[in-house]
Amino acid sequence: MTLNLRVMAPNRIVWNSEVEEIVLSTNSGQIGVLPNHAPLLTALDIGIIKIRLNGEWSTMALMGGFAMIDNNGMTILVNEAEKATEINPQEARENYKMAQKDLAKAEGGKQKIEANLAFKRAKARLEAIDVISFPVSN
């Protein structure tokens, strides 16, 4: 049995197919979704989504949004999404290191918030390509 997954960003449809299982990061923690899941509407944190299709796992970095589960389908609306296959590993590592440094030297509320968001985005991109293992400490 499968469920239909649609991942949509403002400028494109990132994913639209039947899948076997989904694991994603919500604002209250990770959830797993299988066919016949109870209806749910949840906010998504910056993090990754794992998708199982034909016994193989694929990952994507999601930059926050919302997910709705209903009638063996999941629709995800995100600010931005990148498939692991679209992420340059070298660039992702460099961005992560830079974001770590920026977060460490951030001063003031606004700068700390912006640096933390940049760090979370960089961390999600690395997790999507399995360069770093779970969990990564801040």
UniProtKB/Swiss-Prot annotation:
InterPro entries, sorted: ATP_synth_F1_dsu/esu, ATP_synth_F1_dsu/esu_N, ATP_synth_F1_esu_C, ATPsynth_dsu/esu_N
This protein's record includes keyword DNA repair: no
Keywords per UniProt: ATP synthesis, CF(1), Chloroplast, Hydrogen ion transport, Ion transport, Membrane, Plastid, Thylakoid, Transport
Top-level taxon: Eukaryota
Gene Ontology molecular function: ATP binding; proton-transporting ATP synthase activity, rotational mechanism
Keyword Protein transport among UniProt keywords: no
Subcellular location field: Plastid, Chloroplast thylakoid membrane
Membrane topology: Peripheral membrane protein
Stored Pfam families: ATP-synt_DE, ATP-synt_DE_N
Primary role: Produces ATP from ADP in the presence of a proton gradient across the membrane.
Subunit relationships: F-type ATPases have 2 components, CF(1) - the catalytic core - and CF(0) - the membrane proton channel. CF(1) has five subunits: alpha(3), beta(3), gamma(1), delta(1), epsilon(1). CF(0) has three main subunits: a, b and c.
Name of the protein in question: ATP synthase epsilon chain, chloroplastic
Taxonomic source organism: Anthoceros angustus (Hornwort)
Upper lineage: Eukaryota, Viridiplantae, Streptophyta, Embryophyta, Anthocerotophyta
Gene from which this protein is expressed: atpE
